[in-house]
From Swiss-Prot:
PROSITE patterns: G_TR_1, G_TR_2
Its biological purpose: Catalyzes the GTP-dependent ribosomal translocation step during translation elongation. During this step, the ribosome changes from the pre-translocational (PRE) to the post-translocational (POST) state as the newly formed A-site-bound peptidyl-tRNA and P-site-bound deacylated tRNA move to the P and E sites, respectively. Catalyzes the coordinated movement of the two tRNA molecules, the mRNA and conformational changes in the ribosome.
Transmembrane segments annotated in the record for this chain: none
Protein name: Elongation factor G
Tagged with keyword RNA-binding: no
Organism: Nocardioides sp. (strain ATCC BAA-499 / JS614)
Entry's family note: Belongs to the TRAFAC class translation factor GTPase superfamily. Classic translation factor GTPase family. EF-G/EF-2 subfamily.
Entries under NCBIfam families matching the protein: EF-G, PRK12740.1-3, PRK12740.1-5, small_GTP
Binding annotation for GTP: 19-26, 83-87, 137-140
Subcellular location(s) per record: Cytoplasm
Length: 703
């Protein structure tokens, strides 16, 4: 069933399914693909089964839905599901997928409630103001508690849940849901079928009172978010289903409420109403409206693009994937205009022209080649050579740069040593391909040892990348022990440090004099590091304008190798105060060398310190082991931030240096007889205590 791709944009939904790693996201997505498949295959379950089997092979390889965007159809609406990874090491992937979504469904584990990773993803969704609804899953499991999960959404996510459904029955007796908008019951009876059919019934008598109470709460919450509802509610008038649905949609799109539904995807209960809600309450590309980018020449000049085919083409490359049969596929969200196979576009970030090869729409288990695609759609494209994740593609005559994405710097690195000469060559290809796909994966070579060093967001992140090198690129390599990616910065201001570079060898010499000041670069609002900053204070042409960028470049190059132990320096403000030049002997190179050396000398006097990555760690443990766990965290130089009771267990939140967390999995297991679990994510950089810093510096210097 190839549907004409020029779908009415009102009927398109670009959604993400976001969740903690075990909340049942893949199962939910799989069931969505299964039911949406049924609507066109009229119950040919063997095809549905084929889709499912195909998904399971993918899961064996540990990937959640092969495709970065899967298109399916529900009640003549096109739903593009954009996958978001659930593990904290892949925050870059989450950021990137949120950037191209219009709305999201957050899946919660009905037993565990709101988990740390859910909070991280939720915060990222707040940053991009993504309208979202919630699906409380796994209500058939022992210990599942829908109402506690809703309370946690308020406490931990600071959200305004709008409960649209209540569970009927609990744990193994979970039968279905009460629909509070239509005031009816939806039940899925009998385990034998795949849950395609459900009954619409009267609300069971024993739930009538609870349903009335929650219907009242629904109206109260809606009236606070919507003036029209408020007026009618205060006058005591009744609402039609259509009026309520329109109000829920308005409040959801304004990000004032988050509709909450429930069910169990694994037992096939509650998925169709979830799809209905996606269509009814989440935004279409038209609701999101125009996207604002900036001009190629001037970052401060705003350029807008409306989601219409008549506008000039603009799109964002948000994911690169390697397809075993097709090679490199780049996923693009088209924001405006049309994208046609065979056309030429320009990469607005690097200025290169790109020819669009084939354009594919990705379905659950097949890809469909299409000739062209309009605004608001998400497709995969072949044939692009110089485009990376986060780049903008646009009409050559009307260029625009869409907001680029910022990714955190890697915090952990390992040395990787290919076993043979042929592995060396394959490693180069693998690294190139993987760093194209993943901007948080970086590579450098150690100048002293000549080793290749790869860096990423956590141990799991690097393990998966090394595993992919082995499997996809057949690279056999030995991998060193993980090392922490330290940084350096300064704590004191040094004013008017002078350095003169001169060299006289036959012919023209080199001459440059610079006077610089260094100081810590701090953001006054957050009191955290504000990155590198260069200020030019030179007046009266004492350093010609064309040489000033060279001083800046020299200082930045000096920052790549800090003065303490050669780690990259961060958060330094450099001010060029004065200088001198020579008509014949001065050059860009001379000023670059002067800037570089002046920076190094001044940095040594500016009280340089070592910084280390701190991780926010959350440990869940039975109370009997509480003292042991806290003692262990303290011994790792951790700072306990909070502890609370949750479902009979104790949950400890702490900030711990990454260098002290290696091997924590095994230690925690043995100290708590395997009964405790933990999760961790990067938080910030903090100063290393003097005694430990001295040891690290000695080790690096080989003393």
């Amino acid at each position: 069933m190839a549907v004409d791709i020029t779908t009415d944009l009102n009927k398109v939904r670009n959604i993400g399914i976001m969740a903690h790693i075990d909340a049942g996201k893949t199962t939910t997505t799989e069931r969505i693909l299964f039911y949406t498949g049924i609507t066109y295959k009229i119950g040919e379950v063997h095809e549905g089964a084929a889709t499912m089997d195909w998904m399971e092979q993918e899961q064996e390889r540990g990937i959640t839905i092969t495709s970065a965007a899967t298109t399916c159809w529900w009640k003549d609406h096109q739903i593009n599901i954009i996958d978001t990874p659930g593990h904290v090491d892949f925050t870059a992937e989450v950021e990137r997928s949120l950037r191209v979504l219009d709305g999201a469904v957050a899946v919660f584990d009905g037993v565990a409630g709101v988990e740390p990773q859910t909070m991280t993803v939720w915060r990222q969704a707040n940053k991009y103001a993504v309208p979202r609804m919630c699906f409380v899953n796994k209500l058939d499991r022992t210990g599942a508690d829908f109402f506690r999960c809703v309370d946690m959404m308020v406490e931990r996510l600071n959200s305004t849940p709008l409960v649209l459904q209540l569970p009927i029955g609990a744990e193994s007796d979970f039968l279905g849901v009460v629909d509070l908008v239509g005031m009816r019951a939806l039940t899925w009876r009998g385990e034998t079928k795949m849950g395609e059919d459900y009954e619409v019934e009267e609300i069971p008598a024993e739930l009538a009172e609870q349903a009335a109470e929650y219907r009242e709460k629904l109206l109260e919450t809606l009236s606070e978010a919507d003036d029209d509802v408020m007026e009618k509610y205060l006058e005591g008038e009744d609402f039609t289903v259509e009026e309520l649905e329109a109000a829920i949609r308005r409040a959801t799109l304004a990000d004032k409420v988050n509709p909450v539904l429930c069910g169990t995807a694994f037992k096939n209960k509650g998925v169709q109403p979830l799809l209905d809600a996606v269509v009814k309450f989440l935004p279409s590309p038209l609701d999101i409206g125009e996207i604002i980018g900036h001009s190629v020449k001037d970052e401060n000049e705003k350029v807008s693009r409306k989601p219409a085919d008549s506008e000039p083409f603009s799109g964002l490359a948000y994911k690169i994937a390697s397809d075993p049969h097709l090679g490199k596929l780049i996923y693009i969200r088209v924001y405006s205009g049309k994208l046609e196979a065979g056309s030429t576009v320009v990469n607005s970030v690097n200025g290169r022209k790109e020819r669009i090869g084939k354009v594919y729409q990705m379905h659950a288990n097949k890809r469909e080649e299409i000739a062209s695609v309009g605004a608001g759609q998400i497709v995969a494209v072949m044939g692009l050579k110089d485009t990376k994740t986060g780049h903008t593609l646009s009409d050559p005559q009307h260029q625009v740069v869409l907001e680029s994405m910022t990714f955190p710097a890697p915090v952990i690195e390992v040395a990787i040593e290919p076993k043979t000469k042929s592995d060396q060559e394959k490693l180069g290809t693998a690294i190139q391909r993987l760093s194209d796909e993943d901007p948080t994966f970086t590579v450098k070579s150690d100048e002293e040892t000549g080793q290749t060093i790869i860096a990423g967001m956590g141990e799991l992140h690097l393990e998966i990348l090394v595993d992919r090198m082995r499997r996809e690129f057949r690279v056999e390599a030995t991998v060193g022990k993980p090392q922490v990616a330290y940084r350096e910065t300064i704590r004191r201001k040094v004013e008017n440090h002078s350095y003169t570079h001169k060299k006289q060898t036959g012919g023209s010499g080199q001459f440059a004099k610079v006077i610089i000041s260094l100081e810590p670069s701090i953001d006054p609002e957050t009191n955290t590091g504000a990155g590198y900053e260069f200020v030019n204070n030179v007046s009266g042409g004492r350093v010609p304008r064309e040489y000033i960028p060279s001083v800046d470049q020299g200082a930045q190059e000096a920052m790549e190798f800090g003065v303490l132990a050669g780690y990259p320096m961060v958060d330094v403000k450099v001010t060029l105060e004065d200088g001198a030049y020579h008509d014949v002997d001065s050059s860009e190179l001379a000023f670059k060398i002067a800037g570089n050396q002046a920076f190094k000398e001044a940095a040594r006097q500016a009280k340089p310190v070592l910084l280390e990555p701190m991780f926010a760690v959350e440990v869940t443990t039975p109370e009997t082991f509480l003292g042991t766990v806290i003692g262990d965290i303290n011994s790792r130089r951790g700072h306990i931030q909070a502890q609370e009771e949750r479902h009979g267990d104790m949950v400890i939140s702490a900030l711990v240096p990454l260098s002290e967390m290696f091997g924590y999995v095994g230690d925690l297991r043995s100290k708590t007889s395997g009964q405790a679990s933990y999760s961790m994510e990067f938080d910030s950089y903090a100063e290393v205590p003097q005694g430990i810093a001295d040891e690290i510096i000695k080790k690096v210097r080989g003393e």
